[in-house]
């Protein structure tokens, strides 16, 4: 029997801002309550969807503290805490642990394009610097290079608190290798809402989701249906929401999902540069789908 710590429906939480660009902590608390009431399993602030590249260390720590306070004991808080400088990544990981995070999501170093041994040493040093679980985040589309399956598996076997991977490579050969060869208690999560159904069919453990910001009950329902073996139910959910999953990436994440949340009355539509609002034509396309789904 597996005892995987990371599983189910996790939301990659947006960071709401006021018009002056400061963090809207009142809206942040509302979002966390929204997920608590929806039954979301894990809330993950300060990731890509949370615009972490434009947050200061101090802002990230305060966001994590507020999210932990609002989540209480009903949801795990796994905070984004990654950087392409290993020393900085260690600092962020320690800050997240101190702020109350129960786990961290550590992105693969970007821009540097390290070797596989470099990836291994980076994640080893980060994991050994904290006492909480570490989730590796492999997202070649943003980082510019791939952490190979064997490197991830080596980390999973060698380092006790490396407990999961958010695998967003879209490489199903790599995904199957991770699922088939992993240690028993190591979780494999997808980072792609549109791939939830096939990913779970292969034996995946869940999703770290963008769409859960808008439709947390839907995402949890799809994951739970797949876990229970209710394939037809999961297919029906996927069929209904597949276009929304795709339109959330009609422009760079998190711009579309934040626009949607603003239409839903949950946050103001404010981004930090270099992110800017969507083109009007794309706004119209996304709004039409939200209206079709009765979300606005």
UniProtKB/Swiss-Prot annotation:
Gene3D superfamilies: Aldolase class I. It catalyses: L-aspartate 4-semialdehyde + pyruvate = (2S,4S)-4-hydroxy-2,3,4,5-tetrahydrodipicolinate + H2O + H(+). The record marks 48, 111 as: Part of a proton relay during catalysis. GO terms for biological process: diaminopimelate biosynthetic process; lysine biosynthetic process via diaminopimelate. Keywords: Amino-acid biosynthesis, Cytoplasm, Diaminopimelate biosynthesis, Lyase, Lysine biosynthesis, Schiff base. Catalyzes the condensation of (S)-aspartate-beta-semialdehyde [(S)-ASA] and pyruvate to 4-hydroxy-tetrahydrodipicolinate (HTPA). Belongs to the DapA family. This is 4-hydroxy-tetrahydrodipicolinate synthase. It comes from Chlorobaculum tepidum (strain ATCC 49652 / DSM 12025 / NBRC 103806 / TLS).
